[in-house]
Structures are given as C-alpha cells and as structure tokens.
Amino acid sequence: MTHLSKMPTGYTPPAEWKYPIDLSIDYRKPENRMYLLKAWVEALSYTEEHNQQVRLMDYAIEVTEGITQLEKIERKIWMAFLWGCCYNGIGPWTIYSEFPVPPQSPQEFKRFCDWYNLNFERMRFDTDCRYRKSKMIPCVQSYIDWLAGRTQMDAFRPLLETKLQSDQFVKLWDTAMGWKYFGRLSAWNFLEALNMVFGNMYQIDVPGFMLRDRDGSESNRNGAAFLSNRDDWVTKHGKKKINGCPITDEECDILEADLEQAFKDCVAEFGHITFINRLNFETSGACWLKKFFRLKNTRYIGWDAERTWDEIDYMERIWPEYSCKALWEARSLWLPDTLLCEKAPAGHVPGVQKWKMPVFFETGVPLHIWHLQQGTRWEPSEVYTNLKMPVRKIDDNPKSTSVNLMSLLKR
C-alpha cells in the first residue's frame, strides 16, 4: 500500500548519538545552549514528538480501510484544518470521528451545529485556542463558505502548486488568515499540519520566523533570545522584562538571523532523519526551548507522549462512542517503550509528570534527553541520583557579568 505520509515502523535509536549529554556540564550556560538545542532536536527527530498528535491522527487516516486515496486526502486536509482550530488531540479527533469530512451540505452543517452544541461542555481545545471553542461553528462555516462546494483538494491545488515557494506561502497564509477566527497561531498550525499530512510533498514553509511580530511571535522570539545569550531581550507583550522598553526591529532582526542559522544547522544535521522546516522548528527549536528556562509548564522528551496519554484517556472516558485504537497503535510505533505510560512498571501514575518540569532549570542537566540516549525510563526516584555533581540551585551560582538567564533572574 502506498502512503502519502511518513509511516512509523517502530522506534529505532541511532547507533551512536551525535550530541550525547554529559551529566557534569551545566547546559544553562550560554556557551552550552547551542549544543543543548542540537541534542534536543536530535532526540525529537527520532521520537517525532515535534509533530505532536497530528502524526497519530494522520496515521489513523492512512490505515483506514475501504476508502480511496482521494478520500484519504480529503480527510487529511480536514484534519489539518481542525488541528489549526483546536491545537490538541481531543477536538480534532472527536469532530473527525463524527464528521470525517467537512459538513458542506446544509443538512450536514445543521447536523454539525446540533452535534457541537450538544457536546460543547465535553469538547476540549488547547489553552492557546480556548476562545475559539465558542466560535467554532462560525469558524467552520467560514471554511465551508470558502470551499464553495469544491472538494478541499480542488480548492487548495492552485495554492499548493504555485511555482515559487514564497508565493505559495503568501497565498496559503492569506487564505487561512481570511477564515473567521483564524489568527497567526491557528494559521501557522494549520499550514504546519497541512505540510505534514502531505508528507512534505509540497514543501510548504514560511520564508522567515516573523520575529518582528511583537505579540504573535513572542514565544519563539524569546526562545531565540535564550539561544543567542540575549536574555535581556526576553519580552512580555513586546516589552523587555528587564526594563520595560519595547524590543526594536534591529534587535528582532539579530534574533531572526541567529534563529535562522540554528534552523539551517539542524536541517543539515538531522534533516535526513525527519523533515524539519521553519513551521515545525518554531515550536520545537524556539518555543519549547524557551520553556526549558522556567520552573513550570516546561517541555521535556516524553512530555508530548504523556500529555497525549492524558488526552486519549480523557476521550476514552468522556467520549466512549469514538474509538482511539488507531491512536494507541500509532503511539506504540512512534515511541520507545520507555516513553509510553502504558508500558510503565506497576505503580506508575500515567500522564504528564510535573516533577520533571523544574529539574533542568534547577540543575542545568537535561536528564530527559540523557535517559532517552541511555534507553532508560526516567523515574521520580532518579531525579538527582544520576548526576555526577551536587544539585545546583540558581542562587548557588556566582553572579555573572554576561547577560544570561541567572543574572537576569537575580535582577
């Protein structure tokens, strides 16, 4: 059977990791951050966690029997749209399970409206997309109006087959931004998913990281700031946390250039393992890296696997009418057993492990990457026992004269 997307064949680690973690090194230090990024991206390239739940739902469509390739394509595009709307596994999978293609006829759209209103309370959207939950019906209506009776492939084909990649992106971006209640995040996530479900066939990508967008690009810009050892350029609502001054275009351009170079380096080193473009590198290489440098809501190898377990468990309990069998199957094929909650020893509490979140920030050691490289499961009792150094709290570090994380926090 020919598949449009990359299909999982079972997790296989490299014979030798290119960026092994040394437990005696503090990877918070500016001189070690680029190495940390590459170790992180290398790990994600093998677990494919940077493609999040989309890869699981896409797998479910690929293995669906009894439908044609064109029918699969229609389902894939619809799933990408739903991912842009919801940005989690629960919303897209439950809607898709009831409506595997857009509800374009008046009768089907009415059924969608009735179904959505009936199930509104148990529907879940990602926190960043929570306001769209109450606007989902007009959002879908806007998408259907744009389709104007066409199949999705017929509607997107002239945009996808644009000769110049820069023109292709502008057309796709302007189209997505034209749908009701779609903004930068939803348009970005939609295009990232659209490229993935086509197996990178159309090489959809953004020409740059848009770091001059003061609010819309704040998360990835702050990741670029940490990577560039410019922690004094970390902002909130476009203003530097250190002094309240707006970040300038010139400063944004410096960070853009640094992030672009890091992106190109990672493509050169890991692009043969998985496709890496700016659309997915923004999340994995910048936004998630930024979250290393805080105590709560951080990211780590296995975080996506754990939160996905939480979401599938929620659906099986709260939406029992829809099967999640294909999602469980995809997980087992993408991930090593050491990252699967369902393969954990007896007594393990599944789901997101919040005790993991502050470890890197407090010690400078990415134990999550180290454990993946060792092929071992990270257990709560092993938070510090594997370290060849004393636990180094932030306050134990001498004050640095460089502009780095520790000096910024002390200020």
Curated annotation (Swiss-Prot):
Changing residue 287 to A: Complete loss of enzymatic activity. Keywords: Host-virus interaction, Inhibition of host innate immune response by virus, Restriction-modification system evasion by virus, Transferase, Viral immunoevasion. The active site is at residue 282. It catalyses: 5-phosphomethyl-dUMP in DNA + L-serine = 5-O-(L-seryl)-dTMP in DNA + phosphate. It holds the Pfam family ADDT. GO terms for biological process: symbiont-mediated evasion of host restriction-modification system; symbiont-mediated suppression of host innate immune response. Changing residue 282 to A: Complete loss of enzymatic activity. One of its GO terms (molecular function) is transferase activity. The keyword Transferase applies. InterPro entries: ADDT. Transmembrane segments: none annotated. Transfers serine to 5-phosphomethyl-2'-deoxyuridine (5-PmdU) to produce 5-O-serinylthymidine (O-SerT) as a step in the pathway leading to thymidine hypermodifications in the viral genome. As a final result of the pathway of hypermodification, 5-aminoethoxy-2'-deoxymethyluridine (5-NeOmdU) substitutes for about 40% of the thymidines in the viral DNA. These modifications probably prevent degradation of viral genome by the host restriction-modification antiviral defense system. Belongs to the thymidine aminotransferase family. This is Serinyltransferase.
